[in-house]
């Protein structure tokens, strides 16, 4: 949170979740009750539904390109632990390891993975077009092709 507060003039963090508003707001309000950091929140209804009934597959996919009229895709990053969310905008994807409470059982354990990503986020943010940097360093499109997801 400290990093986001300190860089508010250059970073606009937006919560984009496949969760429902009631649940999401309850959690985010605990860490940002005045909406000083996360001014915008996008929920399930902002996701695309991918469904294959014959195979019992149901997934909500986040697509930041649907906001290209109000956000510059050259400057937009989707940070997500699930590679499926990069299918519709692979050049904007920055993967990370999701938090798993089951792995952090004692009170002293902290999830500091995102804190460790601050240098990466700063470096990406310094790029005129984040997509070239992300492609060169993460190449999500090739990963998705290799996994036969594209």
Give a label for each model feature.
Residues 22-150:
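C-terminal cap/substrate-recognition subdomain and adjoining C-terminal extension
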Residues 2-29:
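Substrate-recognition element of Asp-dependent hydrolases with the DxDx(T/V) motif
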């Amino acid at each position: 949170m400290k990093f986001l507060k300190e860089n508010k003039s250059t970073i606009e963090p937006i919560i984009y979740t496949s969760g429902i508003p009631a649940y999401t707001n309850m959690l985010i309000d605990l860490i940002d009750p005045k909406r000083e950091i996360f001014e915008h929140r996008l929920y399930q209804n902002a996701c695309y539904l991918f469904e294959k009934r014959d195979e019992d597959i149901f997934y909500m996919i986040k697509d930041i390109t649907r906001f290209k009229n109000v956000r510059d895709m050259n400057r937009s990053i989707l940070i997500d632990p699930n590679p499926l969310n990069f299918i519709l905008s692979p050049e904007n994807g920055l993967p990370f390891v999701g938090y798993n409470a089951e792995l952090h059982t004692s009170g002293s354990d902290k999830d500091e993975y995102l804190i460790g990503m601050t240098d990466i986020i700063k470096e990406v943010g310094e790029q005129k077009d984040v997509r070239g940097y992300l492609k060169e360093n993460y190449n999500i499109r090739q990963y998705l092709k290799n996994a036969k997801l594209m």
